[in-house]
Amino acid sequence: MDLSGILTSTVDGRTKGMPPESGTLALADIGRQGWSIFSGDLPLPLAVIRKSVLGENSRWMRAFLEKTGARIAPHGKTTMAPQLFKLQLEDGAVAITVATTQQMRVCRDFGVGSILLANQLVGRAEIGYVVGELKRDPEFSFL
């Protein structure tokens, strides 16, 4: 997966978890805002991920998948975080699950090669997008 451009991606107050008055910010600039969950600077509910806990979860999941041979396709649609998609795939997930072709586009833009659509593929534009991706990338796996 190619995450090289993610820090220059922008978000604004319409993005889940961002203060409505925040304006447009590059992801790389969010940490410099001085926002605090405990001061009420960010709209709730929101998810908080501790790096140490994420690392332990990652190690555990990798070991579990290796030991059991289980095949999983975690829900990317919940976080829509390509950084987590990358980690999950590195840990042994066989695909990332999405609910819409818009979510699939995000995955594909960052190089996810195997996607499970947990929905019916309907609509001319949606079908056209998937067919186009399958033609463009013979390695792409659409489940």
Residue ranges and their predicted role:
Residues 56-59, 63, 86, 90:
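A broad, structural surface signal
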